[in-house]
Swiss-Prot record:
Reaction equations catalysed: 2 reduced [2Fe-2S]-[ferredoxin] + NADP(+) + H(+) = 2 oxidized [2Fe-2S]-[ferredoxin] + NADPH
One GO MF term: ferredoxin-NADP+ reductase activity
Name of the protein: Ferredoxin--NADP reductase
Positions contributing to FAD binding: S12, D31, K39, Y43, V83, I118, D285, S326
Length: 344
């Protein structure tokens, strides 16, 4: 039996893992995705400005450090496992069950599932799956691949406009198609992309994808006006889909441990990351409490808070908070290495 099972490997879950390790707890970390990082993996190239003391840098750089920190105390990690139930058997005895039927036991549970299981909405066009490993994209991993390319973006929200704005600086051309009369993203961003000569095509959708000779890459796209039905075919090197996300939060609605909810999709926190069930804590975007800010920075704070509460639940005579890291014995040898690196 582990001290704590953390469900969710995004920034809050990773920091909870680190801080629980710092508090000398054994940790199990479970995530439904094939990689740790949560929603941060959706926008790896976006520049993050709002983490205190961290200079603005691409999200993938922050994520790399966050994962490294989260794994510092060597938690037991399970990827590609979907949690379907949390059962409280007794005080300091929880069972976490996965879709595959695995049952993991721990003394406390931290829920850090963000907005739930998030997957980009797929383009509903025949044969689309054959291009998903080549030049059809739902996530932009690197802007560099679009250098000097003709790029089509489908979607009119903020993410689509952000990608159009950034890619237009290096691409040969960028075209944005969207079904409505106007984009739904910020008006200021619409002005910016227009200034960069991004072509905006309202009331237009992707009707067909035309492949190359061996059907491995998209070579042309048939676009259709949603009202008139007029169609025209355009050559593109890459196609990016930004149609929002499908979200699944069935864990909270179907679990045996019925938590008080703030709304249909967030756990009610009682002043912090405490939930209505002793021994279960929630951190990050999945929890609502009065001091909540939906920032990566506050996800870290939530993670530490949840770990501290789990510690005192498991061991009531433990200190409510851990020692500051600069004075913590566990980092003594690691600190010597870091100091020597900077001195010499």
């Amino acid at each position: 039996m582990k001290d704590v099972t953390i469900i969710g490997g995004g920034p809050s879950g990773l920091y909870a893992s680190f801080y629980a390790g710092l508090r000398d707890m054994s940790v199990r970390l479970i995530d439904v995705q094939s990689e740790l990082g949560g929603k941060m993996r959706i926008y790896p190239e976006k520049i993050i400005w709002d983490i205190g003391g961290i200079a603005p840098k691409p999200c993938h750089e922050i994520l790399k450090d966050t994962i490294k920190q989260g794994l510092y105390f060597k938690p037991e990690v399970h990827l590609n496992e979907r949690v379907v139930d949390i059962r409280k058997k007794a005080e300091r005895h929880f069972e976490v069950e996965t879709e595959a039927g695995e049952i993991y036991t721990s003394k406390a549970v931290i829920i850090a599932i963000g907005a739930g299981i998030i997957n980009p909405k797929q383009l509903d066009v025949k044969g689309v799956e054959r291009y998903q490993l080549t030049n059809l994209h739902y996530v932009v991993q690197s802007y560099r691949r679009f250098k000097d390319k003709d790029v089509l973006i489908s979607g009119g929200g903020n993410t689509a406009l952000d990608w159009a704005h950034d890619i237009a600086k290096i691409a040969k051309s960028v075209t944005v198609v969207y079904r409505k009369e106007d984009v739904s993203g910020h008006e200021a961003m619409k002005t910016l992309v227009t200034d960069l000569n991004v072509k905006l095509c309202p009331k237009t959708r992707i009707k067909y994808l035309v492949g190359n000779d061996d059907e491995t890459h998209i070579s042309e796209v048939v676009l259709e006006h949603v009202e008139s039905g007029d169609r025209h075919t355009v050559k593109f090197d890459d196609v990016i889909i930004s149609h929002g996300f499908d979200r699944c939060n069935t864990l909270l609605s179907e679990t045996s441990s019925k938590l008080d909810m703030h709304d249909d999709c967030r756990v009610k926190g009682f002043g912090n990351t405490t939930t209505s069930i002793p021994g279960i804590y929630a951190c990050g975007d999945i929890v609502y409490h009065d001091a909540k800010s939906h920032l990566i920075a506050s996800a870290f704070s939530d993670g530490a808070n949840a770990a501290n509460l789990a510690k005192t639940y498991i061991q009531p005579d433990a200190n409510a908070e851990g020692y500051v890291s600069s004075h913590h014995e566990v980092f003594k040898e690691a600190n010597k290495t870091i100091v020597n690196k900077h001195l010499y």
